[in-house]
Every structure is written in C-alpha cells, then in structure tokens.
Amino acid sequence: MEALPSNLIFHELIGLYAEVFESTNPKLINICGRVIDETRNMLIIETEDTHEKMVPKNGTTFVFHLPSSSADHDQRVKIFGTLLLSQPENRVKNIRKIRMR
C-alpha cells in the first residue's frame, strides 16, 4: 500500500524522512532525518550526521516527507504524534479493520 496523506497514520513510518515541527521539549525542534526505528512511544530518527535521536511521539508534531512520482519535490504531511501512539504493528493492522466497516 502506498503512503498517502490520508492513510499515513496507519502506514509504516520506517524509512520516511521526518522533521520535528513542534515539541514540548524545545531541544527537539528541527531534528530531521530518516526514521530508522519506531516503538510505541518513540520515533528513532537518524540525522544527517548519523546520530540517532529518540523523539517521543506524545507532545510532538512531525512533518513527514512522502516521496512523490515527480522528482521535483516530496509531499509534506504534518501529523500530531499523539495520533501515532500505539505499537507500530498494531497501527498498521488497524487500517484493515477500518476498511472492513
């Protein structure tokens, strides 16, 4: 399934480029890089200088860059981290339940 703005909260986030847009912790704002791992409460982002930053989902707003078919620019989607609070494998399964309704 392709990652679209409408289904991104149910999609696999590992491998997507992400930015921290807002956070309750000001030190986390503007962290950006590839999502390399995800837990129930955290995204682990590998920055350009290959450091791994653990960013809590709760209290954080992320901007994800979705690759587009045109090489000009990626599509950007802003998502509140609280919408992502669940185990990644369960969140991916939830889209099937919603489609069956």
Swiss-Prot record:
GO biological process, one term: rRNA processing
Single GO term (MF): ribonuclease P RNA binding
Cellular compartments per GO CC: cytoplasm; ribonuclease MRP complex; ribonuclease P complex
Coiled-coil parts of chain: none
Location of this chain's protein in the cell: Cytoplasm
Enzymatic reactions: Endonucleolytic cleavage of RNA, removing 5'-extranucleotides from tRNA precursor
Keyword terms, alphabetized: Cytoplasm, Endonuclease, Hydrolase, Nuclease, tRNA processing
Keyword Cytoplasm assigned: yes
SMART domains: POP4
Major place of residence: cytoplasm
Pfam family of the protein (one): RNase_P-MRP_p29
Protein EC: 3.1.26.5
Family, per entry: Belongs to the eukaryotic/archaeal RNase P protein component 1 family.
Summary of subunit composition and partner proteins: Consists of a catalytic RNA component and at least 4-5 protein subunits.
Its job: Part of ribonuclease P, a protein complex that generates mature tRNA molecules by cleaving their 5'-ends.
Listed name of the protein: Ribonuclease P protein component 1
Naturally occurring in which organism (per UniProt): Methanococcoides burtonii (strain DSM 6242 / NBRC 107633 / OCM 468 / ACE-M)
